[in-house]
Amino acid sequence: MRPINRYPSVDYLHKAARKKLPKFSYDYVDGGSGAGVGLDRNRAALDEITLTPRYITDWKPVEMAVELFGQRYSRPFGIAPMGLAGLQYPKAELKFARAGKKANIPTSLSTACTVDIEDFGAIAGENGWFQLYPPKSEEINDDLIDRAYN
């Protein structure tokens, strides 16, 4: 069965993750930062959106491509960085990179990644972005930037 049929909504994915992942790993993914205020606000805003199908009406294909920082992407969204993604699935960031490249959307790698920056970059290519949490050490900071840039 195709994943889209097994998991018709995010709620189904949520329940499957709770069953499959170790508790510490699930809690990391499921929670927000701090008191979770941002997570609560995002959920409330999304709950206000209603998608209304319009049957038996004329329709035209929608062009969803967008240019951002001089590069053309197929969609106006990308794959956000997730720290310690490898705790959820081995080499998850590399899977994200492949999916982002295939879909031609930006894909971000967190400073708290579980794969080599260079391996991610080799797969993501121009679609790869790097989310830098600057360390106190200027030397380490410069090294991270150099590795992400090259």
Name each model-derived stretch.
Residues 88-91, 109-125, 134-143:
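Active-site-adjacent beta->alpha loops and helix N-cap segments on the catalytic face
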Residues 81-87:
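Glycine-rich phosphate/pyrophosphate-binding beta-alpha loops
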Residues 1-70:
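An N-cap/entry alpha-helix motif that binds or orients negatively charged groups
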Residues 22, 79, 100:
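Conserved, mostly hydrophobic/aromatic
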Residues 77-80, 107-109, 128-132:
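Hydrophobic faces of well-ordered beta-strands that scaffold small-molecule active sites
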Residues 17, 71-80:
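N-terminal small/glycine-rich loop or linker at the start of catalytic domains
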